Design a protein with these regions (language model features):
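MPN/JAMM (Mov34/JAB) isopeptidase/deubiquitinase module and associated MPN-bearing subunits/adaptors
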Residues: 1-103, 107-245
Length: 245
């Protein structure tokens, strides 16, 4: 059954501005250090994980986003610090226990529009697909599903006028594209899921009969028709100027 990934209104500016800042603003390790732009950024999604119930699909609802400022950032990759992630998870668990770590987001910066289109830059890379299951297993091993967002960004030569829209084809349910001044952004959603099955090599003994069954675990990535990304405020904020006044 398709999983709904819901991004609440106040989370959207956190996602977009973190990608824009990493793309447009110079970053230095110190005042006289080398300046870098068009970097990837990485962050975490916090909120609620609602299971399948009465025919309603599983939902991952993001209500807060935090940026991993300790992550190593490059134009082609980003590497989060897992100690930082563990610290934040403990901090939320202590003071906001009602919120769970439900996923990640990171950006894909591109030089121009043609590069994005040629490479389908809004899609997850092979590295992303390998990283998400490992992240799921290491950080949130008992979560049934996690959401993962890719935010692609590029600059435009003039102010974009295209209204926000869903991605085309079989990616329609899982992503959006939007113009914001002299930049264009794509947001595409994925999920990683935990699967448990009986270990075929487990002995058929008294413990097995008593329900103490060894389970094998694996984590896989899902996309497109298996993911429904919902950002209700995106179309309203970017389509209707009245809401921005």
């Amino acid at each position: 059954m398709r999983t709904q990934v819901i991004i609440e209104d106040h989370v959207l500016p956190q996602l977009l501005t973190s990608a824009i800042e990493a793309y447009e603003v110079s970053h230095r390790a110190h005042a006289r250090g080398r300046s870098n732009k068009k970097l990837e950024t990485f962050g975490l999604l916090w909120g609620y994980a609602l299971p399948v119930r009465n025919g309603v699909p599983a939902r991952l609802v993001a209500v807060v986003a935090t940026v991993e400022t300790s992550a190593l950032r490059h134009t082609d990759w980003v590497r989060p610090d897992f100690e930082s992630i563990a610290m934040k998870r403990d901090f939320f668990g202590e003071y906001w226990p009602q919120l769970e770590l439900i996923g990640t987001f990171h950006s894909h910066p591109y030089e121009d529009l043609s590069e994005v289109n040629d490479t389908k830059g809004w899609r997850a890379s092979e590295g992303d697909r390998a990283f998400w299951p490992d992240f799921h297993e290491f950080v949130c091993p008992d979560m049934d599903e996690l959401a993962h967002l890719v935010i692609a960004i590029t600059g435009l030569s003039r102010k974009g006028t295209a209204e926000p829209d869903r991605l085309a084809g079989n990616e329609y349910t899982s992503g959006y594209v939007v113009s914001a001044d002299k930049r264009k952004l794509w947001i595409k959603g994925y999920t990683s899921a935990l699967y448990e099955e009986v270990d075929e090599d487990a002995p058929f003994d008294e413990a097995f009969m008593a329900g103490d069954i060894e389970m094998g675990r694996s984590y896989d990535v899902y996309e497109d028709e298996d993911v429904l990304l919902e950002i209700p405020s995106l179309e309203a904020r970017f389509r209707h100027e009245l809401l921005r006044r």
